[in-house]
Amino acid sequence: MGKLTLLLLILLGWLQYSLWLGKNGVHDFVRVKDDVALQEVNNGKLKARNDQLFAEIDDLNGGQEAIEERARNELGMIKPGESFYRLVPDQSRRNASIPSTQNNAQQ
């Protein structure tokens, strides 16, 4: 009876070791679970970006407004007889706010 008990205890110890520390054990399970959660977050961000790009492609294929907007903003083009005004922020206000922000960052 003693040998059977010892054999069962050794078997139990080996199973516990395999469960907690062995290959595909609890440690590996937790690590893979964390990796999957991180990948799902990354996939969500990439899916949102892809959806935005597909919407932009559909807009470019279907409507003239998006093409005109890009031509104005990126190429500086305008329609005949049209006046295009671009408002630029006041440089004196930008320069006045930059040193105060840098002083706050240094303190």
Curated annotation (Swiss-Prot):
UniProt organism field: Yersinia enterocolitica serotype O:8 / biotype 1B (strain NCTC 13174 / 8081)
Periplasmic face residues: 22-107
Coiled coil: 39-62
Role, per record: Essential cell division protein. May link together the upstream cell division proteins, which are predominantly cytoplasmic, with the downstream cell division proteins, which are predominantly periplasmic.
GO terms, biological process: FtsZ-dependent cytokinesis
Bilayer disposition of the protein: Single-pass type II membrane protein
Membership in a protein family: Belongs to the FtsB family.
Membrane-traversing stretches: 4-21
InterPro entries in alphabetical order: Cell_div_FtsB, FtsL/DivIC
Main location: membrane
Subunit: Part of a complex composed of FtsB, FtsL and FtsQ.
Any Gene Ontology CC annotation: plasma membrane
Key words of the record: Cell cycle, Cell division, Cell inner membrane, Cell membrane, Coiled coil, Membrane, Transmembrane, Transmembrane helix
Cytoplasmic side: 1-3
Keyword flag Membrane: yes
Record's protein name: Cell division protein FtsB
Domain of life: Bacteria
Cellular localisation: Cell inner membrane
